[in-house]
């Protein structure tokens, strides 16, 4: 009996090690930067934005287009500027991403944000991050960085950027990346454990 208990404990420990070893952080592939297509390639100037929309509550009221301005830091292969509609003094840029199959406690987003003119907050699933970008040339000539590491949901998550334009052209840009640990398949750990137990019992009989 004691040997069986020890064997079970050893199998359980080995199974946990197996599951831990297979828990690796991977990119969140449903999170996109502004101004790119589904493959991550930059959209052409004037093209409709594919992953961010401007909302006033729900539903969406405007699809931004890829834009450019000589005063802005240039768009590149990773992201592009998207426009604020003429006459809008404020707008909420919104995107969603899916954490189905991931451990939400392990998720983390790295966001590089620029805006013309200001960001008053960034919300993850309606919860404030306390992040803001103040009015001034640095707002659209350099990046402001934000890391989000909590308030995630299993399934679809909503990310919102609250922007204000103080006159003239308005635009927004974000380079977004993230990673999370995929949820381990319990069946793999169980099969691994059963295999160890069978091997141990076989050796015990032979002995």
Show which residues each predicted segment covers.
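Bacterial N-terminal signal peptides that target proteins for export
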Residues: 2-11
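Accessory carbohydrate-binding/adhesion or oligomerization-edge regions at the termini
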Residues: 26-80, 96-100, 148-181
């Amino acid at each position: 009996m004691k040997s069986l208990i020890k064997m079970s404990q050893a199998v359980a420990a080995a199974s946990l090690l197996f599951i831990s070893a297979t828990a690796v952080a991977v990119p969140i592939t449903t999170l996109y930067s502004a101004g790119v297509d589904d493959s991550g390639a930059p959209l052409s100037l004037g093209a409709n934005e594919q992953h961010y929309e401007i909302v006033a509550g729900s539903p969406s009221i405007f699809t931004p287009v890829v834009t450019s301005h000589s005063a802005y830091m240039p768009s590149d292969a990773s992201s592009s500027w998207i426009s604020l509609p003429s006459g809008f003094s404020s707008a909420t840029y919104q995107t969603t991403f899916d954490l189905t199959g991931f451990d939400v406690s392990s998720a983390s987003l790295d966001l590089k944000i620029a805006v013309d003119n200001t960001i008053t907050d960034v919300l993850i699933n309606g919860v404030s991050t306390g992040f803001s970008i103040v009015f001034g040339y640095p707002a659209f000539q350099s990046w402001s960085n934000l890391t989000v590491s909590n308030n995630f949901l299993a399934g679809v998550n909503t990310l919102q950027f609250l922007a204000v334009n103080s006159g003239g052209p308005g635009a927004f840009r974000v380079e977004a990346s993230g990673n999370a640990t995929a949820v381990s398949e319990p069946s793999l750990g169980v099969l691994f454990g059963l295999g160890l137990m069978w091997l141990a019992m076989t050796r015990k009989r032979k002995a």
